[in-house]
Amino acid sequence: MKIVYVYDSIARIGGMERILTDKMNYLAEIYGHEVYLITSSQGNHPLSFPLSDKVEHIDLDTKFHLQYQHPLLEQLKVGWTLNHKFEQKLKKEIRLINPDIISGNTSFKADLICKLDCKAKKIIESHCAKIYTRIPANRKKSFFKDIKDRYVSYQCFRDVKRYSDAIVTLTQGDAAMWGQHPNIHIIPNTTSIDIQTISSCEAPRVIAAGRLTW
């Protein structure tokens, strides 16, 4: 089976990047599937987690972050140009690979992935609570930018619900936020951390892990 993962880059040391890398490695190494990683803007950045040699990595060299250097109106123009460039390159690679499954993420071009004209089933993973998705960490308090972000999010979520073959969330609560969809699956994150010893529980230290940062 041919499986394509589409993401912006595996350059940050984050939970989402680790999980995606673990999945791709597992599907390629253990199940023997043909796995492809298509990134938009990996560039010369090293992969933040080890990727199996059996996973083929294709970078489309479309640096979306460059649009945010411009004022809002110019952002729209530059953003449209980058989107068009990325869409054409992605469609070309999909035609060449002819995959059975394409997996995307709600944080990156999920609406475009869902509407690709090909035989592949489109699976969209939601690694964040829906109401917090697509909110940039450096978000500026601007009325017009807020309106733009809300519209883009609405459009993306509408298309994901309409065109995706399946939505994968991490928790029951996340799944409920998507409302009525014929094919929602709840798959918690896995861990590949190899623990050699069991804690004695004597150290006066508490570690808390959370997903919501806004």
Per-region residue spans from a language model:
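Active-site proximal beta-strand in glycosyltransferases
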Residues: 3, 101-103, 116-137, 147, ...
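Conserved donor-binding/catalytic core segment of Leloir-type glycosyltransferases
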Residues: 4, 199-214
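N-terminal strand-loop element at the rim of the active site
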Residues: 5-13, 26, 30-77, 177
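Histidine-centered beta-alpha loop that forms part of the nucleotide-sugar donor binding/catalytic region
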Residues: 8, 62, 106-107, 126-130, ...
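Nucleotide-sugar-dependent glycosyltransferase donor-binding/catalytic pocket residues
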Residues: 12, 192, 211-214
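Membrane-proximal helix-turn-helix segments that form the acceptor-binding/catalytic region
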Residues: 88-92, 130-132, 144-166
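Short N-terminal targeting/anchoring amphipathic segment
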Residues: 90-109, 123
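Carbohydrate-associated surface elements
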Residues: 173, 190
